[in-house]
Amino acid sequence: MTKFVFVTGGVVSSLGKGIASASLAAILESRGLKVTLIKLDPYINVDPGTMSPFQHGEVFVTDDGAETDLDLGHYERFITTRMRKANNFTTGQIYKTVLEKERRGDYLGKTVQVIPHITNEIQEYIKRGAGLGTAHEVDVAIVEIGGTVGDIESLPFLEAVRQMSLRMGPNNSAFVHLSYVPWIAAAGELKTKPTQHTAKELRAIGIQADALLCRADRPIPDDERAKISLFSNVPEWGVISMWDVDTIYKVPRMLHEQGLDGLICDKLRINTPPAKLQRWDELVYEVEHPQQEVSIAMVGKYVDLSDSYKSLNEALRHAGMKNHARVKIDYIDSETISPQDVSRLAKYDAILVPGGFGQRGVEGKISAARFAREGKVPYLGICLGMQVATIEYARHVAGLKNANSTEFDPETPCPVIALITEWKDADGTVKTRNEKSDLGGTMRLGAQSSDVSAGTLAHSIYGDVVTERHRHRYEANVNYLDELRAAGLVISALTQREHLTEIVELPQDVHPWFMGVQFHPEFKSTPWSGHPLFNAFIKAALDHKARSAGGAKNLKAVA
């Protein structure tokens, strides 16, 4: 029978519930348990697909094509279970489902209310996410409830998990609550009152926390933990200190050493072998002992919020670890780059242009791609980054001076990038769209496979077939591919059905490392293996740094 751990948060948002949940899952998995995680988001949007990155951060895409919360990226990087559409749902999805049932007459004329209809539907979604009765069923499902206790948006979710815990009976569920313990510099002490109040508010809803994770900028002394225990009705061993660390990969060891996993296993009556966290210790050692440093210029549109590129940041750091190097990322707003000052990118060892939507800042990205191509600086373009590299090449090499994307100029005479009108989705169904289609849920999403041409840089990285996750509406226009090929651009991967362009590159006798990919490889990177594309990109950056230093000896790098 699947056991459940419900993770809630109090006082303020952004405490790190996602990292805490993923870390607990990682420890339980190291004990031999099959674990999954589910994220409940209390906003009314159906999914985060149409939300601004400044509002929500990155949209993480699963293999089956779900646009989800960025916490699912943490989940996949910390445990081996792959996330699915069922692992993330929102208030919008719940209400949409309930209203559809009401319209069909499924409720047999009853008055549809938050309790029981909304709360029952939430419980059904949680069970679906845990894979109950299917091949995806797990030993433990950790359910992270977004928002903060006390928010009106979260109340139906908290009521639903309270009911669910009651129905499952004792020892089948546990509650973990994150709180904030601020350090007041003027007083020179930690203040526990906010944590006392959030635990009290949780009890008023009918939920008693089994463990309190107390977030602070420093370890919490034993006397303060005892005080929190007394006023929150949580045993002292259940008051866990969770202080700031320089890498998130230290959190599993931190929580384990304070006995969180043992407490949860005792509460759920689960007998397991001891936790094995050696690989986490080795990972932290690799983070803390780089042999060299490499600097990457990330030229993007959403650089004011690093969470907009969360998986990308992690993928670069993973690749750095595989190459025994610290990766220093400088975020550069593409709106600030012009052909006149693009040379300021010369100090970097490589240039990366990530995905994005809309016209703002596009010309700056095109200038960055041109600088990388002409200066022989390693370049990786992802999604829009591939498209701007294609536009740049068409304008300045292929002679198509007015080349553009119909996303930025619908009337362009040379639409080298255009809207995809038909494609096969991750589940094999054929999808169509046009300029008047809704924005939400109409992109090419999820894992897609492509054939890779032999003898190319892409083939040396991926082999014969590449399968990666996608999230885009626009694609290289097949009507211009022959002209681009004739001008020297290598189209090294095409989809197997529609022959859509997936990878473009320059011959290695023309440029040492220049590649654009239509997909999002960052979603499949892990701290254990990195990702072959990013591993190769960071190695190319290290090689470029060595060449720029006049042939200085390069330390061994592994791609």
Swiss-Prot record:
It comes from the Bacteria. The active site is at C383 (nucleophile), H520, E522. Pfam families: CTP_synth_N, GATase. GO terms for molecular function: ATP binding; CTP synthase activity; glutaminase activity; identical protein binding; metal ion binding. Gene3D superfamilies: 3.40.50.880, P-loop containing nucleotide triphosphate hydrolases. InterPro entries: Class_I_gatase-like, CTP_synthase, CTP_synthase_N, GATASE, GATase1_CTP_Synthase, P-loop_NTPase. CTP binds at S13, D151, I152, E153, K191, T192, K193, P194, T195, Q196, K227. Belongs to the CTP synthase family. This is CTP synthase.
